[in-house]
From Swiss-Prot:
BPL/LPL catalytic domain boundaries: 42-215
Keyword Chaperone: no
Entry function: Catalyzes the transfer of endogenously produced octanoic acid from octanoyl-acyl-carrier-protein onto the lipoyl domains of lipoate-dependent enzymes. Lipoyl-ACP can also act as a substrate although octanoyl-ACP is likely to be the physiological substrate.
Additional observations: In the reaction, the free carboxyl group of octanoic acid is attached via an amide linkage to the epsilon-amino group of a specific lysine residue of lipoyl domains of lipoate-dependent enzymes.
EC numbers on record: 2.3.1.181
UniProt protein name: Octanoyltransferase
Keywords: Acyltransferase, Cytoplasm, Transferase
Active site per the UniProt annotation: 179 (acyl-thioester intermediate)
Disulphide connectivity of cysteines: none
Length: 215
């Protein structure tokens, strides 16, 4: 059963609002994103939603079933974002960006670069060298993926966003080819010497995203 979504309102500058929630059911948030986007007007403020998900595999519109190698009893949801299969679970920051891309004069590639840049900026604060990849969207540290990206564009507006691994059980990634890449390693901030709590990193990521979107 899809549960109603409750997000704590935290105002942001320049028509951008940031909202926080705890650990949420994926289907509930997905339906809420679609409803928000469908009801937007040209004056609707853009929003960033920061939360975590209960364990779930999400399969993008281009997702191939063979990238799910086995199913350890975790739900699989075929969603409407771009990309292949990935895993979400507690201990991972989910940042959903609900933006009017026409109003921001942003193309998809530009937005992807800004999202990657925000994560790179955050990790740079902790002297962790990270980078994006032109051919495989996301953020990587030493060849291991630490953040996955996926978007849905509808009527010039976007939803979905990024997932940053912080301090989670990485074992479910072993049951998939993450983002469709065989043998792709994954990592997380807690394995890179970053000891700040998830809530601290959430706030910092929000600031990095807002800064990148203003550039």
């Amino acid at each position: 059963m899809i549960q109603p979504v409750s997000l704590e309102f935290v105002p942001g500058p320049s028509g951008l609002e940031v909202k926080y929630a705890a650990v949420m059911d994926y289907l509930s948030i997905w339906q809420a994103m679609k409803a928000f986007t469908a009801s937007r007007t040209q004056n609707t403020p853009d929003e960033i939603w920061l939360l975590q998900h209960w364990p779930v595999y999400t399969q993008g519109v281009a997702g191939k079933p063979e990238h799910l190698l086995c199913n350890p009893g975790i739900p699989v949801v075929r969603t409407d974002r771009g990309g292949q299969i990935t895993y979400h679970g507690p201990g991972q920051i989910i940042a959903y960006l609900l933006l009017d891309m026409r109003r921001l004069k942003l193309g998809v590639r530009d937005l992807v670069r800004k999202m990657e840049g925000a994560v790179v900026d955050l990790l740079d604060e902790y002297r962790v060298n990270a980078c994006g990849d032109e051919d495989a969207p996301g953020v990587y540290v030493g060849g291991a993926k630490i953040a996955a990206l996926g978007l849905k564009i509808k009527n010039g507006c976007c939803y979905h966003g990024l997932a940053l691994n912080v301090s989670m059980d990485l074992a479910p990634f072993m049951a998939i080819n993450p983002c469709g890449y065989t043998g792709l390693r994954v990592t997380q901030t807690s394995d890179l010497g970053i000891t700040d709590e998830l809530e601290t990193l959430q706030g910092k990521l929000a600031e990095k995203l807002k800064a990148r979107l203003k550039q």
